[in-house]
Amino acid sequence: TRKESSAASDVYKRQIRNYAESGGRVLAECGGMIYLSKGILLDRSEHSDSEVGLQAGVLPFFISNRKADRRLTLGYRQFDYNGQHLRGHEFHYTQFEPKLEESLESVTQVYNAKRMPVSTPVFRYKNVIASYTHLYWGEIDLLKLFE
C-alpha cells in the first residue's frame, strides 16, 4: 500500500541520514544530492496537494522542481579537489531553492570544458561530498576524495 511504501521510505531516509551523521562516506551526484537535501519544492497538481517532497535532510537546502524555476543546465565540468583533477558532466532542470542559493558555499570552483567558471557548487558535509556533477571515475582514486 501507499502508506507502507511511505513508511519504508521514511525508514530508509533515516538510515541514510544516520549513516552520514556518523561519518559514513557518501558520494552524491545529481539525484543523490537531491535525495540528501531537505526536500523538493513542487507545484500543486491534481495528483498532489503537497508542495514539498521531503527528502533525507542531510544537506541544508531545498531543491526546486517548480515550473517557474526550471531551466536546463548542462555541460562538461572539471574541478580540483583533494589533490585530484576531476571531470564529469552536468545535466538537470532542477535548481537550488532561490532564497537559499546565496548562502550555499562550494568547497571548490567548478569550470566548464573551456576552463570558464560555472556556478555549479560542490558541497562537503562530514564525509558527504555532493554536487550536480556526474563524475568520470576512470582516472581518480575515489577514496582520496574523503581525506
Task: Locate each region found by the language model.
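Single conserved hydrophobic/aromatic residue that forms the stacking wall/gate
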Residues: 1-8, 12
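Short amphipathic alpha-helical segments and helix-helix/interface helices
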Residues: 13-17, 143-144
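Feature representing long, continuous alpha-helical segments
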Residues: 14, 31-34, 54, 117
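Catalytic nucleophile loop
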Residues: 17-39, 134
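Short hydrophobic-aromatic micro-motifs
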Residues: 28, 88-91, 128-133
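Pocket-forming structural segment of enzyme catalytic cores
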Residues: 38-117
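Acyltransferase
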Residues: 120-147
